[in-house]
């Protein structure tokens, strides 16, 4: 649960809205600290097929943002959507949301001993450094 401008939002509901987009294979939503709103939702998503180019990827990310706003309201609209090749997971398949949040807030991701694929976390780092977002 994240608190966006006094509204308590479930990350699962936002993930389900993003996942309803036909291009999305998998999504993770985290709350990132924001001076004005307290927290804002940020989406990390993998696509079913690789986008043709950066413009197509940004268009898909913008569509995801609109899908969330249409289904859950403007308050749930993600501040950013990052398209990554894979989401960081444990060996048992659980998403490492705390690591995603730490990287998004430029903090140390902490203990990564359970990380299944280190390349997934490195991809997230690269995407965050490039600022490849849709808004």
Model-derived features: positions:
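A cross-kingdom feature marking charged/low-complexity
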Residues: 123-135
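AMP-binding/adenylate-forming catalytic core of the ANL superfamily
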Residues: 1-76, 85-86, 93-95, 99-102, ...
């Amino acid at each position: 649960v994240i608190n966006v401008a006094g509204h308590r939002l479930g990350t699962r509901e936002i993930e389900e809205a993003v996942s309803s987009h036909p291009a999305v294979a998998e999504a993770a939503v985290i709350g990132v600290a924001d001076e004005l709103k307290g927290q804002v939702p940020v989406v990390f998503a993998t696509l079913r097929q690789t986008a043709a180019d950066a413009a197509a990827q940004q268009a898909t990310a913008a569509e995801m943002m609109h899908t969330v706003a249409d289904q859950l309201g403007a308050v749930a609209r993600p501040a950013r959507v990052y398209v990554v090749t894979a989401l960081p997971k444990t060996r048992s398949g659980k998403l490492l949301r705390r690591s995603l949040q730490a990287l998004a807030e430029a903090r140390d991701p902490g203990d990564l001993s359970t990380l299944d694929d280190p390349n997934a976390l490195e991809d997230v780092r690269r995407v965050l450094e490039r600022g490849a977002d849709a808004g």
